[in-house]
Amino acid sequence: TAQGFHFNNATMKPIVNNAGWKKAFELYKETGKYGPPEELNLDIGDTRALFKAGRCGLLVEWGDPGPLQLDDDATAIKGKLYAISALGSREVLNRATGELVPVNNVNAPHAIDGINYAPFAAFGGWAGAVNKGADQKTKDAAYAFLSYMNQSAQSSVDVTIGATGYNPYRLSQLSSPDLFVKAGMPQALAENYIGAINGALNSLNMASDMKIPGAQKYTSVVLDTELALS
């Protein structure tokens, strides 16, 4: 993350037209050979329905699929999951040349056994805000609601329900699989699920989603333009 994942930190030019991006698109295109014919038109709800029906051998997602397999309509996959934080690579991008080079201790100091892992914190998490123009009673009510939703008593239930979109985020939720075992996960799966999330969060090489003013414009306008010209 410190290196700048989305763009050159000095020039703000998107890092897209290089061998790393080309390889990523090639791999992404390759996965299409193994998906359903309508894959390009599927949204998140569609893919999760296929997942719960037992039609997915591999799903790249947030942490939601873990508790989603507890749903009544997910009997085809209940207890049959295995989670990992992210796949890695034996090559990394040389930013000076734009080419891929083999992993070594210098260009990938956090690599493990010659493989560089870079879990991506996609989306970046939920946030709540209170309108400063609201009257005080409304502000107090909004604050009380946000506080209630985030306190351990409520959030520790919500993270075990896939439909909430909440994933474990409090230390108490990440330190033990007990919440998920209580919700119905097999012990081994609960340990695997929490372990995968912790593996990503604790990675020294985690790539954070963009958190700058105007990020939406950058990703939907500037980046799209660069990709079209690449």
Describe the role of every protein-language-model region.
Residues 52-62, 79:
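Alpha-to-beta junction loops
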Residues 61-77:
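A ligand-binding cleft/hinge motif common to bilobed small-molecule-binding domains
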Residues 97-113, 160-228:
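Long, aromatic- and glycine/proline-rich binding clefts that accommodate carbohydrate-like moieties
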Residues 1-10, 25-29, 117-131, 217-229:
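Periplasmic solute-binding protein
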Residues 33, 74-172, 207:
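Extracytoplasmic/periplasmic substrate-recognition and gating elements
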Residues 44, 61-66, 85-87, 124:
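Beta->alpha turn/N-cap motifs
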Residues 2-41, 82-89, 101-109:
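Glycine-centered hinge/linker elements that transmit conformational signals in sensory
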Residues 38-53:
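Short helix-initiation/N-cap motifs at beta->coil->alpha
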